[in-house]
Structure formats: structure tokens, C-alpha cells
UniProtKB/Swiss-Prot annotation:
Function according to Swiss-Prot or TrEMBL: Binds directly to 23S ribosomal RNA and is necessary for the in vitro assembly process of the 50S ribosomal subunit. It is not involved in the protein synthesizing functions of that subunit.
Signal peptide residue numbers: none
UniProt superkingdom: Eukaryota
Single Gene Ontology MF annotation: structural constituent of ribosome
Database matches in PROSITE patterns: RIBOSOMAL_L20
GO biological process: ribosomal large subunit assembly; translation
Name of the coding gene: rpl20
Family the UniProt entry places it in: Belongs to the bacterial ribosomal protein bL20 family.
Cellular compartments annotated: Plastid, Chloroplast
Protein name: Large ribosomal subunit protein bL20c
Main location: plastid
Length: 117
């Protein structure tokens, strides 16, 4: 059986891995086997952290909204605000409410006072 030279195909595969791992440190950017393992690990981390980022931002938005609504009244909280918003069928999501809480507190106070009535 004759020997098969896999130069082009193998070199193209290794080049793709090296381009992905170019910014990694040490042997992880130079050695093919280490770079392949680090690439798989990086992709797993990216997939996991996309979900984690969504949870983290949701928690941040809730904290910001709650802080501003508690300034408004002593017996008023985030949960009551969201309940009243849904009751009135106002379609304001947490991202928009958090931006209002940071950029324009008065607007959020007006909204919360109107939906209490």
C-alpha cells in the first residue's frame, strides 16, 4: 500500500485551529493538541456564559428598578410595581425600566404613581 501524504488537508485543519487560538497564552497558541483542547474548552465556556450573562443582567435590572421604586414610597417595591404593570397591561420590559431608573428617575416615579391609582 502506498503512503498517503495528507499535507494540504491536515495543514488547513491545523491552520484553522491556530487562527482560533492565536490570542491564547503559551503552548495553547502554538501546539496543535493543546490548542485543540483549549478551543473546545473556550467554546464550552462561551456557551455556558451566554446563559449566565442573561441571568446576571436580569438580576442587575431588577436591583436597579427596586432601588428607585423604594425611594418613591415606603410601602412600594419592585414586585408590586411589576404586578401593577401587568394588571394595567403596560408592556415595559425590565431592560427599559432599568434604563428609565438610571437616566430619568422622575419618569419612573410618574409611571409608578399613575398605575397605583
Amino acid at each position: 500500500m502506498t503512503r498517503v501524504r495528507r499535507g494540504y488537508i491536515a495543514r488547513r485543519r491545523r491552520t484553522k485551529i491556530r487562527l482560533f487560538a492565536a490570542t491564547f497564552r503559551g503552548a495553547h497558541s502554538r501546539l496543535t493538541r493543546a490548542a485543540t483542547q483549549q478551543k473546545m474548552r473556550a467554546l464550552v465556556s462561551a456557551h455556558r456564559d451566554r446563559g449566565k450573562q442573561k441571568r446576571d443582567f436580569r438580576r442587575l435590572w431588577i436591583t436597579r428598578i427596586n432601588a428607585v421604586t423604594r425611594e418613591n414610597g415606603v410601602c412600594y417595591s419592585y414586585s408590586r410595581l411589576m404586578h401593577n404593570l401587568y394588571k394595567r397591561q403596560l408592556l415595559l420590559n425590565r431592560x427599559i425600566l432599568a434604563q428609565l431608573a438610571i437616566l430619568n428617575k422622575n419618569c419612573l416615579h410618574i409611571i409608578s404613581n399613575e398605575i397605583i391609582k
